[in-house]
């Protein structure tokens, strides 16, 4: 989808408002964002520190009949961890694992770093097993 490339490019050059407008215009053009479109927007929002909006978008995604996949969850979790939103990240790891998905190498590495900072965290230990 050409719109995915455009939205990704806009996010990469920090034109998030334009990316958001293009994303929101898709249904008006008779197009539905797909899993990659959502993941691209979530990554763009996370890069700019708009964590709550990224979390909301993932929830809207699921509500719009486009179920997140492991890449979508890993993208959001990595964004949360980069902005020190550890408790939210753990919540989404639990949801991701509950849906049968696994953390990718980068997410697992970030979780291991968290565990090394707090070796007594039972939740993190459980998630990494």
Indicate residue ranges for each PLM-predicted region.
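Pentatricopeptide repeat
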Residues: 3-4, 8, 19, 24, ...
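Alpha-helical solenoid repeat scaffolds, predominantly canonical TPR units
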Residues: 22, 57, 92, 126-127
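Alpha-helical linker/edge segments of TPR/alpha-solenoid repeat scaffolds
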Residues: 117-127
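C-terminal structured "cap/appendage" subdomains that terminate the fold
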Residues: 80-100
């Amino acid at each position: 989808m050409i719109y995915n490339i455009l939205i990704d490019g806009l996010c990469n050059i920090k034109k998030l408002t334009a990316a958001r407008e293009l994303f929101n215009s898709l249904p008006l053009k008779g197009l539905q964002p797909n899993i990659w479109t959502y993941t691209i927007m979530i990554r763009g929002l996370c890069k700019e520190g708009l964590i709550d909006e990224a979390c909301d978008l993932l929830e809207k995604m699921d509500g719009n009949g486009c179920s997140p996949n492991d890449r979508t969850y890993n993208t959001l979790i990595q964004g949360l961890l980069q902005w020190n939103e550890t408790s939210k990240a753990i919540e989404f790891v639990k949801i991701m694992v509950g849906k049968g998905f696994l953390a990718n190498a980068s997410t697992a590495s970030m979780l291991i770093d968290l565990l090394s900072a707090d070796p007594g965290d039972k939740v993190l230990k459980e998630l990494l097993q």
